[in-house]
């Protein structure tokens, strides 16, 4: 058992350092999602790895003789958690959890949702708006680009109240609107 005040590593690095296909895939994802470094990508992969491990454990428990009601309870807990974060559909099963891709996890980051909702022109600008405190969820400022947005919070993303970007005539807002028209 470790000391609770100590920060622990939240990701696992790849086993092979120089694997050409993996490096190319990582580079593409970093550019597409505007990640700062590969550590952010590895964190997303580690989170998915934990979910898939939980799903595999459920399959093993089911074949190992766990009662049906206990299996359904544990499965519903896992699926409801993933549904709340928008990673699976409402009627998902263990197979859907095992089929999760890292892109689905990265799509739920605040940085990606700010870009997709039209608050920024590029992934880098979305990241900048978030870190500079221009973006809020439910009226509360969020300054973490990697914040995992729940399905219920998705509609509540907006510009932060005192931010100059709340003004419709702000020059950057007009640039964002023009970029969205193209």
Swiss-Prot record:
Residues 108-172 form the S4 RNA-binding domain. One of its GO terms (biological process) is ribosomal small subunit biogenesis. GO terms for cellular component: small ribosomal subunit. SMART domains: Ribosomal_S4, S4. The keyword Ribosomal protein applies. It holds the Pfam family S4. The keyword Protein transport does not apply. One of its GO terms (molecular function) is rRNA binding. Part of the 30S ribosomal subunit. Contacts protein S5. The interaction surface between S4 and S5 is involved in control of translational fidelity. One of the primary rRNA binding proteins, it binds directly to 16S rRNA where it nucleates assembly of the body of the 30S subunit. Belongs to the universal ribosomal protein uS4 family. This is Small ribosomal subunit protein uS4.
């Amino acid at each position: 058992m470790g000391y609770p005040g100590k920060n622990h590593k939240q990701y696992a690095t790849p086993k092979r350092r120089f694997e050409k296909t993996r490096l190319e895939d990582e580079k593409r994802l970093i550019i597409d999602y505007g990640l700062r470094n590969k550590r952010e990508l590895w964190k997303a992969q580690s989170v998915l790895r934990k979910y898939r491990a939980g799903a595999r454990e459920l399959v093993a428990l089911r074949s190992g003789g766990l009662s049906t009601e206990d299996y359904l309870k544990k499965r519903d807990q896992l699926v409801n958690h993933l549904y709340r974060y928008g990673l699976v559909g409402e009627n998902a099963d263990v197979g859907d959890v095992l089929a999760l891709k890292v892109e689905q996890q990265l799509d739920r980051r605040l940085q990606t949702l700010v870009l997709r909702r039209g608050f920024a022109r590029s992934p880098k600008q979305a990241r900048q708006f978030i870190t500079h405190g221009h973006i809020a969820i439910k009226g509360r400022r969020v300054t973490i680009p990697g914040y995992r947005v729940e399905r219920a919070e998705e509609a509540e993303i907006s510009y932060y109240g005192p931010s100059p970007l709340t003004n419709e005539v702000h020059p950057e807002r007009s640039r964002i609107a023009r970029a969205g028209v193209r």
